[in-house]
A protein has these predicted regions:
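Core segments of cupin and vicinal oxygen chelate
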Residues: 1-29
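A short, acidic/glycine-rich surface segment
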Residues: 8, 17, 36-42, 79
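Vicinal oxygen chelate
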Residues: 20-23, 30, 67-105
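Short secondary-structure boundary/capping segments
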Residues: 21-22, 42-45
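Short, charged/polar surface micro-motifs in flexible loops or helix N-caps
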Residues: 25-29, 38, 60-61
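Short, solvent-exposed beta-strand edge segments and adjacent coil->beta transition regions
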Residues: 48-52
Length: 105
């Protein structure tokens, strides 16, 4: 999704730690990490601290198509696609570990 390419990942057999880098066309990267011993406490969609990450995809058509693709793959769409009160065209989905992803033009 979001035209990111994943590396082959890293897995430390001794600790169970795993990580993947997602690299985007412009060179930006995000590292996704997991360690089995971490407590998975319930998360609310509205919360303090890290709440969501937004990706600008360039057009209304791409917002619509990507939202439909994610929904078809089983992700929960919690809003949109729509134009917000402050004029942004967006949708929001709930992704891995209940993290919210906002898809904007």
């Amino acid at each position: 999704y979001f035209r990111a390419k994943s590396n082959d990942g890293y897995h430390n057999q001794k600790t169970g730690f795993c990580s993947y880098f997602l690299t985007f066309e412009d060179g930006a990267r995000i590292e996704i990490m997991n360690i089995p011993e971490m407590a998975d406490l319930p998360k609310k969609i509205v919360r303090t601290g890290y709440s969501h990450i937004a990706f600008s995809v360039g057009s209304i058509e791409i917002v619509d198509a990507l939202t439909a693709e994610l929904k078809a793959d089983g992700y929960e769409v919690i809003s949109g696609p729509r134009t917000t009160g402050d004029g942004y065209y967006e949708s929001c989905i709930v992704a891995v570990e209940d993290n919210q992803i906002e898809i904007t033009v």
